[in-house]
C-alpha cells in the first residue's frame, strides 16, 4: 500500500469513528498554501478541524506526539483561510481542533486537542 493509500485508509477510519460519535462529515483533504486539513466535520453548530495521525508503534512517542507546534500553526492558518472563504472567522464562529491519533491498532480521539490562540 502506498503512503497516500495508507493515509486515505486511516482518514476513512477516523471519519467513520467520528460519524459514529455524532459528528457530520463536511470535507476531506482541504489544501491551502502552507497547510492541509485532513477532515472538516460539524459537531452541532461547531466546525471541527481534524488532524489524523498514524504511527505503526509508539517507539518515538506515538501518533499524537507527532503534532508539533509548527503543524498546529499550519492547521490554524488553513482553518482561518477556510473560514474566511465562508465569511467567518474564529471570532465569529464556534470551532475546535481535534486529533485522531492511531498508533498500531489503537485509535484515540482527542477533542479540542489544541486551541486557536
Swiss-Prot record:
Top-level taxon: Bacteria
SUPFAM superfamilies: Restriction endonuclease-like
Species annotation: Yersinia pestis
InterPro entries, sorted: Restrct_endonuc-II-like, tRNA_endonuc-like_dom_sf, UPF0102_YraN-like
Family: Belongs to the UPF0102 family.
Gene3D superfamilies noted in UniProt: 3.40.1350.10
Name the record gives this protein: UPF0102 protein YPO3549/y0119/YP_3803
NCBIfam families reported for this sequence: PRK12497.1-3 (NF009150), YraN family protein (TIGR00252)
Amino acid at each position: 500500500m502506498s503512503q497516500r493509500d495508507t493515509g486515505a485508509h486511516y482518514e476513512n477510519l477516523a471519519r467513520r469513528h467520528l460519524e459514529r460519535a455524532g459528528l457530520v462529515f463536511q470535507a476531506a483533504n482541504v489544501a491551502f498554501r502552507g497547510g492541509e486539513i485532513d477532515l472538516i466535520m460539524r459537531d452541532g453548530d461547531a466546525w471541527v478541524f481534524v488532524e489524523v495521525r498514524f504511527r505503526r508503534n509508539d517507539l518515538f512517542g506515538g501518533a499524537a506526539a507527532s503534532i508539533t507546534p509548527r503543524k498546529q500553526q499550519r492547521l490554524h492558518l488553513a482553518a482561518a483561510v477556510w473560514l474566511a472563504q465562508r465569511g467567518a472567522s474564529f471570532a465569529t464562529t464556534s470551532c475546535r481542533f481535534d486529533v485522531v491519533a492511531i498508533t498500531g491498532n489503537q485509535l484515540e480521539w482527542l477533542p479540542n486537542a489544541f486551541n486557536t490562540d
